[in-house]
């Protein structure tokens, strides 16, 4: 039992144990004492908790137009996708503010499915939305998930990532955003229900249904598999926004067949070459996703479907140079800190974009290409005080010549050529 005084008979704080001589004030209660320092600490904790609650009431959710304007600062192109996402996100958090029901009208969740090729900006759009709204954000890879009881991750581990992103504040996590990538990889192998167990396909879709719709999920705090003798974190997924993304390679022929089979007369079919193949993805319908291998219930949990276009050469050049976090701007800023001006020639940027298209990596491949080009520059220039300007040329990108370096007096020098052993 805690003693309220020490050997000398002095009163002590019941919380920190300091005597009345060690603190400025000791407040007495029924059989308990608390010092001014503990009162101050408790006040700070309570204010912090209340502050978090106010922050997550979402009274000032940005309007769809404002959301798209901020997305424009970080993501190039994809205007239709931005518009769809802005409206869906605005409606989702408006629904949270209203308490899901308005005059007996129940507002359903607006989870989102993004379809687009690798490197088209799906993950970046989801990350930027979370940053705009200042909510916890987690990314999960659908390919690592398996049905409960099999080797792999349980779907509840997705929720654990969100809880960790919210510093284990479950209330904050319950209003966060989860992006599930590679969702097309959990399509079942055929359109027909499988007799055999499909633990990483249809089984995962079934497991995801409840958390997408809204349920009280039990999450193991350390991750991994559940077992009966461990504690769980309870989290309500009703107000978590789920954004699923995937390339859906192979869905174009399904869309093309549907569009080409418009019956004329007594069952004659249109020539399938009449179908415009350029923007097939934008014409996707739930029935195409069903044929691809998503189960009807899973498609129903993702009411907002938006598509992203493949990035062309000019879009990739814009991605390199225009956004706030453009990689060229980042390298220019880093070299500026060393007193060096960095310049990319237009032809060099165009060649970098062409390489990314050839590799079929989209915007994702731009960073690795630039980092390969800039490695020697970033290694050597900080040690050279005679360089004022560094120019990346077409030949630099092609690997035939090193970057052009210019001294403070205007004379041109070159980095030493590397010779292979």
Curated annotation (Swiss-Prot):
Gene Ontology CC entries for this record: HslUV protease complex
Similarity annotation: Belongs to the ClpX chaperone family.
Gene3D superfamilies to which the protein is assigned, alphabetical: 1.10.8.60, ClpX chaperone, C4-type zinc finger domain, P-loop containing nucleotide triphosphate hydrolases
Signal peptide: none
PANTHER family recorded: ATP-DEPENDENT CLP PROTEASE ATP-BINDING SUBUNIT CLPX-LIKE, MITOCHONDRIAL (PTHR48102:SF7), ATP-DEPENDENT CLP PROTEASE ATP-BINDING SUBUNIT CLPX-LIKE, MITOCHONDRIAL-RELATED (PTHR48102)
PROSITE patterns: CLPX_ZB (PS51902)
Keywords: ATP-binding, Chaperone, Metal-binding, Nucleotide-binding, Zinc
Xref: InterPro entries: AAA+_ATPase, ATP-dep_Clp_protease_ClpX, ATPase_AAA_core, Clp_ATPase_C, Clp_protease_ATP-bd_su_ClpX, ClpX_bact, P-loop_NTPase, Znf_CppX_C4
Purpose: ATP-dependent specificity component of the Clp protease. It directs the protease to specific substrates. Can perform chaperone functions in the absence of ClpP.
Keyword Metal-binding annotated: yes
Matching SMART domains: AAA (SM00382), ClpB_D2-small (SM01086), zf-C4_ClpX (SM00994)
Complex and partners: Component of the ClpX-ClpP complex. Forms a hexameric ring that, in the presence of ATP, binds to fourteen ClpP subunits assembled into a disk-like structure with a central cavity, resembling the structure of eukaryotic proteasomes.
GO molecular function, one term: ATP-dependent protein folding chaperone
Key word Signal present: no
Lineage, uppermost ranks: Bacteria, Bacillati, Bacillota, Bacilli, Bacillales
Gene (name only): clpX
Protein name: ATP-dependent Clp protease ATP-binding subunit ClpX
